[in-house]
UniProtKB/Swiss-Prot annotation:
GO biological process, one term: lipid catabolic process
Glycosylated residues, chain numbering: N115
Entry EC number(s): 3.1.1.-
Other facts noted in the record for this chain: Patatin have a dual role as a somatic storage protein and as an enzyme involved in host resistance.
Motif (GXSXG): 75-79
Name this protein carries in UniProt: Patatin group D-3
Localization, UniProt: Vacuole
Tissue expression: Tuber.
Catalytic residues identified in the record: S77 (nucleophile), D216 (proton acceptor)
Signal peptide stretch: 1-23
Function, in words: Probable lipolytic acyl hydrolase (LAH), an activity which is thought to be involved in the response of tubers to pathogens.
InterPro entries documented for this protein: Acyl_Trfase/lysoPLipase (IPR016035), PNPLA_dom (IPR002641)
Organism this protein belongs to: Solanum tuberosum
Location (main, coarse): other
Length: 387
C-alpha cells in the first residue's frame, strides 16, 4: 500500500513538473536579434535558412516562417535589412522573403550595392542609389505598423544626436515613427563613410511634418542589437498581458537567439601599444570602427551570458558567432562572388562548431533545440487560443 501511495505521489510530481514546464514554455517571450555587418549578413542569412528549415520540418509546414515564431525581431544595419525581409508582408500577408531567399538576395544585389562608388576622396564611398532602389522595389509602401511581428530597428538622428528606434509598440505614442520600411532599412544601413545619411519626413500625431536625418543603427546602439531587442520585448509587457512574465526582466521566461556577422581575433595579434602610439587620425580611422564593433559585441554577449546564467537559464540564450574570420571575409563591402561564397561557407562551417569551449554542443544541435522550443511553444499557444 505504501509503495502504491509513493508511486502515485511520484506520478503527481512528474505531471506537475511537466505541466509547469509546458506552462512556462507557453508564457515565454521569443526574441531574435541580428547584428550589422554589410555583406557579412550572408552569415546570419545562412543560419536563418537552417533554422527556418528545421521549423518547417518539425511542423510539417513548408510555409512556416520565422515571423510566426518570434515575438520580437530586431536588427541593426544589415541586420535591420534581414529583419525587414522576414517581417514585411507581401500581398498574401506573409513575409515577402523566406529565409532561404536571403543569401540569393545578397548574391543578386550585393555587387551592385557595393559597386556604385562615388569616386571621391571626400564623401561616402558609395552613393547608395542602388541600395535605395532595391529597397523600394522589394518593400514597397509598407510601413512599420504592417510588420508581421514586433520589430526593433535602430538608427541615429545626427540632427538631434539621439537614437531612433522603430518599433510597432511605440506608434500609439509616437506615430511619426510609422515610417516606410525602405526608409528605415536604408537609414539603419547608412554607415558613415560608406553611404550618405538619409533624410525623410513623416507626420506627427497633430499632422505636422516630422524630419529624420539618419545614419547607421550601429552608431546609435552597437553592432549587436540584442539588448535593444530585449528592451523592446520588455516594454511590450506594459501593454500586452501575454508578456507579463518578463515585466521584471525574468530571463527564465525569455528565449533569445542572437546572430552575429562574424569577427576576427587578428586585431589582438597585429597591433601593439608601441606601434599604435605612432598612429595618426587616418590610421586609426581605418580600424577603429571594427575594433569598437568587436569590443561592444563581445561585451554584450558577456553581459547576456552572465545574466542568463545567474538566473539558471543559460540554455535560453544562444549567441551564434564566428570569431575567427580571416582575409576578405572580414570586409563589410567585399561583394565579389568569391568572397560571398566564402561567407556562405563560414556560415555552414559554423553550424558544425561547438558553441564554446565549455559547451561541446554544436551550433547545429543548439539551433535544433531552439527550433523544438519555438515549435512546441507555437503549438501550445495555438491550442490555448482554440479553446
Amino acid at each position: 500500500m505504501a509503495t502504491t501511495k509513493s508511486f502515485l505521489i511520484l506520478i503527481v510530481m512528474i505531471l506537475a513538473t511537466t505541466s509547469s514546464t509546458f506552462a512556462s514554455l507557453e508564457e515565454m517571450v521569443t526574441v531574435l536579434s541580428i547584428d550589422g555587418g554589410g555583406i557579412k549578413g550572408i552569415i546570419p542569412g545562412t543560419i536563418l535558412e537552417f533554422l527556418e528549415g528545421q521549423l518547417q520540418k518539425m511542423d510539417n509546414n513548408a510555409d512556416a516562417r520565422l515571423a510566426d515564431y518570434f515575438d520580437v525581431i530586431g536588427g541593426t544595419s544589415t541586420g535591420g535589412l534581414l529583419t525587414s525581409m522576414i517581417t514585411t508582408p507581401n500581398e498574401n500577408n506573409r513575409p515577402f522573403a523566406a529565409a532561404n531567399e536571403i543569401v540569393p538576395f545578397f548574391f543578386e544585389h550585393g555587387p551592385h550595392i557595393f559597386n556604385s562608388s562615388t569616386g571621391q576622396f571626400f564623401g561616402p564611398k558609395y552613393d547608395g542609389k542602388y541600395l535605395m532602389q532595391v529597397l523600394q522595389e522589394n518593400l514597397g509602401e509598407t510601413r512599420v505598423h504592417q510588420a508581421l511581428t514586433e520589430v526593433a530597428i535602430s538608427s541615429l538622428d545626427i540632427k538631434t544626436n539621439k537614437p531612433v528606434i522603430f518599433t510597432k509598440s511605440n506608434l500609439a505614442k509616437s506615430p511619426e515613427l510609422d515610417a516606410k520600411m525602405y526608409d528605415i532599412c536604408y537609414s539603419t544601413a547608412a554607415a558613415p563613410t560608406y553611404f550618405p545619411p538619409h533624410y525623410f519626413t513623416t507626420n506627427t500625431i497633430n499632422g505636422d511634418k516630422y524630419e529624420f536625418n539618419l545614419v547607421d543603427g550601429a552608431v546609435a546602439t552597437v553592432a549587436d542589437p540584442a539588448l535593444l531587442s530585449i528592451s523592446v520585448a520588455t516594454r511590450l509587457a506594459e501593454k500586452d498581458p501575454a508578456f507579463a512574465s518578463i515585466r521584471s526582466l525574468n530571463y527564465k521566461k525569455m528565449l533569445l537567439l542572437s546572430l552575429g556577422t562574424g569577427t576576427t581575433s587578428e586585431f589582438d595579434k597585429t597591433y601593439t601599444a608601441e606601434e599604435t602610439a605612432k598612429w595618426g587620425a587616418i590610421q586609426w580611422m581605418l580600424v577603429i570602427q571594427r575594433m569598437t564593433d568587436a569590443a561592444s559585441s563581445y561585451m554584450t554577449d558577456y553581459y547576456l551570458s552572465t545574466v542568463f546564467q545567474a538566473q539558471n537559464s543559460q540554455k535560453n540564450y544562444l549567441r551564434v558567432q564566428e570569431n575567427a574570420l580571416t582575409g576578405t571575409t572580414t570586409e563589410m563591402d567585399d561583394a565579389s562572388e568569391a568572397n560571398m561564397e566564402s561567407l556562405v561557407q563560414v556560415g555552414e562551417n559554423l553550424l558544425k562548431k561547438p558553441v564554446s569551449k565549455d559547451n561541446p554542443e554544436t551550433y547545429e544541435e543548439a539551433l535544433k533545440r531552439f527550433a523544438k522550443l519555438l515549435s512546441d511553444r507555437k503549438k501550445l499557444r495555438a491550442n490555448k487560443a482554440s479553446y
